[in-house]
């Protein structure tokens, strides 16, 4: 969104949420762009033609896309996301993206991140702060910790 570029908006968000919000959003925007660039390289060079780290960067951008940018308009919970929930999910996705992962090959990366995205999507369907929501969040954090 262009709003994030305006100082007035940043000031408003800093008061309404916190001072780190715009920096985190900009970080995720940069990761999305980097993921798109890497997707193009993978398409040209093939999966084996790029380092495993490139696949990790690409799949981190997919997490951002699937978990934050895509919403299910037909789901009562996911259709409308209050600010507190947005902040919580954004922080979780930032943590996922900042984590360093260890993989032996690109297929391992793909399988891992598909499972992680699925858990995140299931969390998006759960009522915020419910037992189910918190359980999904715990599973996600455990899954991230296992690969570090």
Predicted regions and their residues:
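Conserved catalytic/coupling modules of large nucleotide/cofactor-utilizing molecular machines
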Residues: 1-148
């Amino acid at each position: 969104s262009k709003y994030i570029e305006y100082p007035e908006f940043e000031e408003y968000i800093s008061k309404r949420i916190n001072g780190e919000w715009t920096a985190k959003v900009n970080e995720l925007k940069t990761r999305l762009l980097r993921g798109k660039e890497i997707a193009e390289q993978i398409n040209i060079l093939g999966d084996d033609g790029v380092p495993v780290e490139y696949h990790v960067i690409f799949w981190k951008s997919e997490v951002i896309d699937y978990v934050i940018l895509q919403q299910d308009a037909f789901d009562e919970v996911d259709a409308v996301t209050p600010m507190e929930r947005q902040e919580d999910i954004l922080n979780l996705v930032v943590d996922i993206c900042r984590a360093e992962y260890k993989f032996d090959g690109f297929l391992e990366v793909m399988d891992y991140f598909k499972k992680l995205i699925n858990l995140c999507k299931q969390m998006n369907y759960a009522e915020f702060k419910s037992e189910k929501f918190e359980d999904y969040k715990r599973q996600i954090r455990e899954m991230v910790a296992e690969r570090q």
